[in-house]
Amino acid sequence: MSIRYESVENLLTLIKDKKIKPSDVVKDVYDAIEETDPTIKSFLALDKENAIKKAQELDELQAKDQMDGKLFGIPMGIKDNIITNGLETTCASKMLEEFVPIYESTVMEKLHNENAVLIGKLNMDEFAMGGSTETSYFKKTVNPFDHKAVPGGSSGGSAAAVAAGLVPFSLGSDTGGSIRQPAAYCGVVGMKPTYGRVSRFGLVAFASSLDQIGPLTRNVKDNAIVLEAISGADVNDSTSASVDDVDFTSEIGKDIKGLKVALPKEYLGEGVADDVKEAVQNAVETLKSLGAVVEEVSLPNTKFGIPSYYVIASSEASSNLSRFDGIRYGYHSKEAHSLEELYKMSRSEGFGKEVKRRIFLGTFALSSGYYDAYYKKSQKVRTLIKNDFDKVFENYDVVVGPTAPTTAFNLGEEIDDPLTMYANDLLTTPVNLAGLPGISVPCGQSNGRPIGLQFIGKPFDEKTLYRVAYQYETQYNLHDVYEKL
């Protein structure tokens, strides 16, 4: 029995009913990776020996009817900027090549406690800076729907592995769209939770006021199951929130009659491709047929999202990445003959082009002569963007729109044009700036490449997002398409 495209929910039932052993599931996953990943290139490191050992231990517990854990026996792939004790965590950078952590991230502790099985680490844009997974030092992941196309980024490996049926779920991180955009490009479900919903302890920091870990899956309910497992306050992360409600599944099947949905006119404006507009408009009609009330609204400061995001994120990155200096860990230049040379050469040689670009931008924005003109002004714009959402949410339950302005572009098409690449974040960065939850679900295809629909919710109201996304998924999904890839 092949379980390659089985859902998390179905796998849990099969294991609970003893129709399949965790070790059989893990074997099937590694067989699929061996067959498919030389083409997709989603994994950077595999943890096969430990995974098989863990699965065999779970077999014994299964035989004793001791199947504790929300994700008992479920295989998982983890983005390579999330710390995994004893397994390489490189952030897809030469700077951290062969770096093996000696502690565990909070999300990994939670997943291990729920008896999920770590399969390996997934490719990404270097230090999560990029929108195509092409800035990875190690390899370029391809889109399972079209091998000429990018999978999106920065969590491109996480999205591609799920779409290709290599793992039933993965974790990514989202700073300005890095879960939702690759989810849209690869036709899977990706959730960026509310800022503070999931602990960031053990996530290698890019922009600390924006970063958030979230799940990628092939359906909405699976996504909700995984988020339940990783949510919660953490003493090791002072920005994590104490929120009691982490039940995202019990009401997921509830209808959406009367739900008030806002469609911002800016989300279907300039820069959004016609095929994407058409798919989203069709999705809106579907929501109406399900009983939702959809009305046009305005989020007037949307256009300032990209410039303010790139100033703030780059400024925080220039500070966070200052720790990589060639001294304590990471790449150490062998050609340096003084301390100053060691700093300069280790960072110049260890970081890639895009990472250095953002460090330069952030350092400039924080410099004394430009701080007020760039960083301070961007923070003021951030407040305006948040206020726009607050005003809309006084009268509406959910905001809907495209996840990305286009479908996936071709490999090599935009990598040398950073401004065009940054423009792809038009519809995702405002959600991070406002600290809100956002989920991307498939809503169509154009020339064989998936289109993503984004739902944005009130702070800590992931439950409503899952409900509306689940109901929409009953009318449109790609479940029958994955196996044909």
From Swiss-Prot:
InterPro entries: Amidase, Amidase_CS, Amidase_dom, AS_sf, GatA. It catalyses: L-glutamyl-tRNA(Gln) + L-glutamine + ATP + H2O = L-glutaminyl-tRNA(Gln) + L-glutamate + ADP + phosphate + H(+). Gene3D superfamilies: Amidase signature (AS) domain. The keyword ATP-binding applies. Its EC number is 6.3.5.7. GO terms for molecular function: ATP binding; glutaminyl-tRNA synthase (glutamine-hydrolyzing) activity. Allows the formation of correctly charged Gln-tRNA(Gln) through the transamidation of misacylated Glu-tRNA(Gln) in organisms which lack glutaminyl-tRNA synthetase. The reaction takes place in the presence of glutamine and ATP through an activated gamma-phospho-Glu-tRNA(Gln). It holds the Pfam family Amidase. The keyword Hydrolase does not apply. Belongs to the amidase family. GatA subfamily. The active site is at 79 (charge relay system), 154 (charge relay system), 178 (acyl-ester intermediate). GO terms for biological process: translation. One of its GO terms (cellular component) is glutamyl-tRNA(Gln) amidotransferase complex. This is Glutamyl-tRNA(Gln) amidotransferase subunit A. PANTHER family: GLUTAMYL-TRNA(GLN) AMIDOTRANSFERASE SUBUNIT A (PTHR11895:SF151), TRANSAMIDASE (PTHR11895). It comes from Staphylococcus aureus (strain bovine RF122 / ET3-1). The gene is gatA.
